[in-house]
């Protein structure tokens, strides 16, 4: 009888202390935080490689903005924003979390053609 009681005590102690796996897409330990800043008339880094779900923090200087554009607009130094793309105003900070594996192109409107960059998401 005492052996059974001890066994049950140990069983419930270990069972109550075990941790349930709560890893979901919203709580993914494999995601990373990346920061994009401005320096003179450039984004730093000019090309960022990351993964779906990573957090990308934009920290823009006062005379810079960042708007997402199409690849065509990017290549032609055209600041036309794409529909439903990300946009951060002059001197703003903000977060962008990519949900699609593709290349996101963005520019600083007043500093084209020098100030443009891309985010490559795998």
Question: Where do the language-model regions lie?
Answer:
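Sec-dependent signal peptide recognition
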Residues: 1-7
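Residue-level signal for mature regions of secreted extracellular proteins and peptides
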Residues: 10-11, 101
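C-terminal motif of bacterial Sec signal peptides marking the signal peptidase cleavage site
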Residues: 13-16
């Amino acid at each position: 009888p005492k052996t059974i009681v001890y066994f049950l005590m140990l069983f419930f102690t270990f069972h109550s202390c075990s941790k349930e796996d709560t890893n979901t897409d919203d709580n993914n330990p494999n995601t990373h935080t990346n920061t994009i800043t401005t320096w003179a008339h450039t984004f730093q880094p000019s090309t960022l490689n990351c993964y779906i779900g990573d957090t990308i923090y934009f920290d823009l200087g006062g005379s810079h903005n960042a708007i997402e554009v199409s690849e065509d607009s990017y290549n032609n130094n055209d600041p036309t924003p794409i529909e439903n793309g990300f946009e951060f105003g002059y001197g703003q900070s903000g977060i962008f979390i990519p949900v699609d594996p593709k290349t996101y192109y963005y520019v600083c409107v007043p500093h084209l053609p020098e100030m443009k960059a891309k985010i490559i998401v795998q």
